[in-house]
């Protein structure tokens, strides 16, 4: 009798945590585990629920606690070998600097460790963190080896120092990002509201593989009549799985991975919307959906053969 053995991929996910709901680590952990990853979870904060609710309570971990857990515990004492580190919200400038320094050294010391960095700064024109964190993230992106960065539109604008309103703006922003941050191998901007697509009631998700192409690619995604929390965290987690998971012998291109991830995430958002409408009844205006229905979307998450959301368009840079 013969058997095929494979090693389960292991990821350290450093993000926020909520007791109720699905953002940060709660949006990443179950989907990654359900798709076969061994996930070590480091919670940078512990809140009752996310800040999109009217009220929340909880606490932030201190810089010393976070550093001790990663440096002395996981790496120093246990000597755990990770395939990937997925980092998101960190509560202050010092925590961001210290944790990024440890993760950066870990990735510099081993080609096998890939850093997926979600530079959590804010959204919709509003900062979630101290303004000093912008400069810290710029320094991190300049000096460390990043496998994939996943900013949203607002974060991309902060990182490159320009507004993005049109497709040409997006092209210039990607060019500037690559010039400023040459150690970042791949970038996906998880949501772009561009003037060319507003009449179509669509938004754009765009990417660039700095090592493999001179073209930006983008997918045009139909809008769902709702505001979601946690969708960006889910995209980052599912890109980690699609690009680095053990389901295939050869790594997919960033463009192909993003097409599959967008199909999966959009399917989850649509099912979440449909379940909310079933509970609330038909709605004429945009509804605020606080939490993704991840448990109810197990049938979507378990698929091995994920279709693409469509064919991407490309722009030469």
From Swiss-Prot:
<keyword id="KW-0862">Zinc</keyword>
<dbReference type="GO" id="GO:0005829">
    <property type="term" value="C:cytosol"/>
</dbReference>
<keyword id="KW-0067">ATP-binding</keyword>
<dbReference type="GO" id="GO:0009443">
    <property type="term" value="P:pyridoxal 5'-phosphate salvage"/>
</dbReference>
<feature type="binding site">
    <location>
        <begin position="190"/>
        <end position="191"/>
    </location>
    <ligand>
        <name>ATP</name>
    </ligand>
</feature>
<feature type="binding site">
    <location>
        <position position="16"/>
    </location>
    <ligand>
        <name>substrate</name>
    </ligand>
</feature>
<dbReference type="InterPro" id="IPR004625">
    <property type="entry name" value="PyrdxlKinase"/>
</dbReference>
<comment type="similarity">
    <text>Belongs to the pyridoxine kinase family.</text>
</comment>
<keyword id="KW-0547">Nucleotide-binding</keyword>
<protein>
    <recommendedName>
        <fullName>Putative pyridoxal kinase BUD17</fullName>
        <ecNumber>2.7.1.35</ecNumber>
    </recommendedName>
</protein>
<feature type="binding site">
    <location>
        <position position="128"/>
    </location>
    <ligand>
        <name>substrate</name>
    </ligand>
</feature>
<keyword id="KW-0539">Nucleus</keyword>
<dbReference type="GO" id="GO:0046872">
    <property type="term" value="F:metal ion binding"/>
</dbReference>
<dbReference type="InterPro" id="IPR029056">
    <property type="entry name" value="Ribokinase-like"/>
</dbReference>
<dbReference type="GO" id="GO:0005737">
    <property type="term" value="C:cytoplasm"/>
</dbReference>
<keyword id="KW-0963">Cytoplasm</keyword>
<keyword id="KW-0131">Cell cycle</keyword>
<dbReference type="InterPro" id="IPR013749">
    <property type="entry name" value="PM/HMP-P_kinase-1"/>
</dbReference>
<keyword id="KW-0418">Kinase</keyword>
<feature type="binding site">
    <location>
        <position position="233"/>
    </location>
    <ligand>
        <name>substrate</name>
    </ligand>
</feature>
<dbReference type="GO" id="GO:0042823">
    <property type="term" value="P:pyridoxal phosphate biosynthetic process"/>
</dbReference>
<dbReference type="Pfam" id="PF08543">
    <property type="entry name" value="Phos_pyr_kin"/>
</dbReference>
<keyword id="KW-0479">Metal-binding</keyword>
<dbReference type="GO" id="GO:0005524">
    <property type="term" value="F:ATP binding"/>
</dbReference>
<dbReference type="GO" id="GO:0008478">
    <property type="term" value="F:pyridoxal kinase activity"/>
</dbReference>
<feature type="binding site">
    <location>
        <begin position="220"/>
        <end position="232"/>
    </location>
    <ligand>
        <name>ATP</name>
    </ligand>
</feature>
<dbReference type="GO" id="GO:0005634">
    <property type="term" value="C:nucleus"/>
</dbReference>
<comment type="function">
    <text>Required for synthesis of pyridoxal-5-phosphate from vitamin B6. Important for bud site selection.</text>
</comment>
<keyword id="KW-0808">Transferase</keyword>
